[in-house]
Swiss-Prot record:
Name of protein: Putative uncharacterized protein LOC645739
Organism: Homo sapiens
Taxon lineage: Eukaryota, Metazoa, Chordata, Craniata, Vertebrata
Domain of life: Eukaryota
Coiled coil: 4-43
Keyword annotations from UniProtKB, A to Z: Coiled coil
Length: 79
């Protein structure tokens, strides 16, 4: 009787240990995926910042072009 209980407890311990190992591996894998996702996110943030900077430069150039076109139009009208 005691031997059976001891064997059952040992079996439960082995099962719990295997479950713990499995969960630890899953946690490690999930953590690795999270790190990769964070790295991807940071790279995307850098790209978005660069695109915003380029967009602002384009808008600035458009403004310069409008001023230049107004000057050209004024010169044509004055001639």
């Amino acid at each position: 009787m005691v031997w059976q209980e001891n064997e059952d407890l040992r079996k439960q311990l082995v099962e719990a240990s295997e479950l713990l190992k499995s969960q630890a591996k899953e946690l490690k894998d999930a953590h690795q995926q999270q790190k990769l996702a964070l790295q991807d996110f940071l790279e995307l943030c850098e790209l978005v910042a660069e695109l915003c900077s380029q967009k602002q430069k384009v808008w600035d150039k458009e403004g310069e072009m409008e001023v230049a076109m107004q000057k050209v139009n004024t010169m044509w009208q004055e001639s």
